[in-house]
Every structure is written in structure tokens, then in C-alpha cells.
């Protein structure tokens, strides 16, 4: 598996590859997408740190650095900058809370390793 060294590369890989325009054809729901990423990168390391753990930090960074902006703007960032075709905007999901949920779900996978 290719490992991406920078935060932006990892976020683009996660959102662009796993939440691409056809994500609903690959997986039945959002938890399944996140779980597939965790399976794909289970045990992988970059410079001695878990690839999944790095993404957890990246997701938390994304939330923290954008905590003052509206949820709609954060959904737009995940699309415009990172290539995500998932948005909970139409179901009323808050982007900040959703990203934290994704980070927690990935962290749970780490704790099982």
C-alpha cells in the first residue's frame, strides 16, 4: 500500500479514494467505507507511526482548524480540497461532528490491533 507523507496527501487519499463519486457502489454505508479504509491500512506504518493513527490526527486537525466556520463551509472544504463526494449536509449532519465520528471509528480500529 502506498503511504502518503503529508497531511494533505493523506486527507486527499482518504476522501478522494474512499469517498469518491462512486462510494455508494463500493460500500453500503458510511461506516463500511471507514471500516474498509481501516482494513486496507491495518498494521501499516509511516516513519514508525500507524498510518491510521496519522489519519486520525489529520481529521482532528481539520476539525480544530475549522471549528469557527459553519458546517456547510467545512463540507465544502472536504469536497473542494480533498475530493470527498460524501456530504451529510442534506440530512442535517454537522461536518465537525461527522469528522470527529470518523476519527473515533478509526481510533477504535487501532485499539483492536
Where are these predicted regions, by residue range?
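Short terminal alpha-helical segments
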Residues: 1-40, 99, 103-110
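Alpha-helix boundary/N-cap detector
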Residues: 2, 6, 47-50, 54, ...
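Membrane-targeting and insertion segments and their boundary/processing signals
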Residues: 4, 69-76
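Generic hydrophobic secondary-structure signal
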Residues: 11, 15, 52-64, 74, ...
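Short alpha-helix boundary/capping elements
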Residues: 19, 23, 63-70, 79-90
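Amphipathic alpha-helical interaction modules
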Residues: 22-72
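Amphipathic alpha-helical binding modules
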Residues: 73-113
